[in-house]
Amino acid sequence: MRIGVPAETRAGETRVAMTPETAKKLKAQGHTLLVQSGAGLAASVTDAAYEAVGVEISDAAGALSCELVLKVSAPSAEELKHMKSGAALVGMLNPFDAEGLAQLAGAGLTSFALEAAPRTTRAQSMDVLSSQANIAGYKAVMVAADKYQRFFPMLMTAAGTVKAARVVILGVGVAGLQAIATAKRLGAVIEASDVRPSVKEQVESLGGKFIDVPYETAEEKEAAEGVGGYARPMPASWLERQKVEVAKRVAMADVVISTALIPGRAAPVLVTEDMVKSMKPGSVIVDIAAGKAADGVGGNCLLTEAGKTVVKHGVTLVGETNLPALVAADASSLYARNVLDFLKLVITKEGEFKVDMEDDIVAACLMTQGGDV
C-alpha cells in the first residue's frame, strides 16, 4: 500500500513519524513510501537518507493523499483537505479532543490515536506516551541545569566547596523516573513525591529520597494505587497533607521538576504562588505539564505560562510544552519504532490494511471509522 509521511506543521514540532530505519523495514514488505521533502530535516534526517532506502520524496499533497498517513500530531484543517475519504491515519491524535476527532470523522478517515494503547505488556513496544515521556524527563533536567545559575554536583576546589543542587521531582511516572536518574547523574540531591506508594522503591533505587505522606483512610489508600499505571484523583484530606510536606521541600529546593498528569483530566496544581514565593532567588521550575491545566495555560505550577520561560518572584519558570521535540532525532527514532510496531497489527502479511476489532490494542486506539467517532 501507499504510505505517506508529511512534514509536521504544528508550531515547534520537530519530530517525524518515520525514519530511514523504519522505512527500510516497511519497504521490505513491499509498500510504496512517500515522504514530504524536508519532513525529517529538524530531526537530522535528510531527503537523501530517505531516498537511500527507497523512499520517494514528495510534496505535502502527495504524502497526505496516500492510503495510510503517518503523523506525529493531528492534522490541521488545511492538511485534512488533501486527505482522501477512507484513508487511514496513525499518530498522537489526542483521544480526549472531541472536536478534533469529529473533524477526522467528518473527513471520512479511519484514525488511530496511539496514546490510547492499553498499558499492557503486549502494547509496551508501541507505547508512545512512555517513549516520549522518557525523553521529556531527561530534557527537563537538562533545561533546568541550563537555566540554573549554579552547579548541580558538589565540588570541592582550592577556592572552596560548592554545595550540590537540591532537586524536587513531583510525579514519579516515566518522565519523573528519568528526571531522577538524569539529575542523579549530574550529582544533584533528589527528593521525589507521588501519590502512589508503590513508586517509593523505584525512587530509592535511582538514588532519590521519597517524600512520604501516610494514608489515614481506606479510601486514600485505594485511590493511591492508581489504575493502568496512572494516578487517580486523590481525596482532598490527603492532598492537603501532601501539600504541606511538598511545600516544605519546595521552599528548600534549587530546582523543581513537575511531571504530574492524569489522562483526560486537567493537570493537578501542585505548586502554588505562595510556594513559588518561598523559593530562593535563582531557583528554577520546569513544568512538564505546561498547557495542560484547566485554563490551557498553566500546569502543575499555578504561575506557569505555556510556551514561555518567565521569571516570577525571582524564580525562573519554564513552560515548554513539547520537550521531546527538543531532542528531535532520538524522539523521532523511538516514535517511529512505536508506529512500526503498531502497523504490524493493522497491516496483514499480504500487505493489506485490516482493522481487527478482536485485537484489544487496535480496538483501544481506533478513534474514527466510516464517519463515526
Language-model-detected regions and their locations in the chain:
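Glycine/serine-rich phosphate-binding loop and adjoining beta1-alpha1 elements at the start
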Residues: 2, 8, 75-166
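Glycine-rich phosphate/diphosphate-binding loop of Rossmann-like nucleotide-binding domains
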Residues: 6-45, 153-249
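A structured beta-alpha segment of the ubiquitous adenosine-cofactor-binding alpha/beta core
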Residues: 54-64, 74-75, 221-256, 260-275, ...
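Adenosine-phosphate binding glycine-rich loop
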Residues: 115, 121-158, 289-290, 294-373
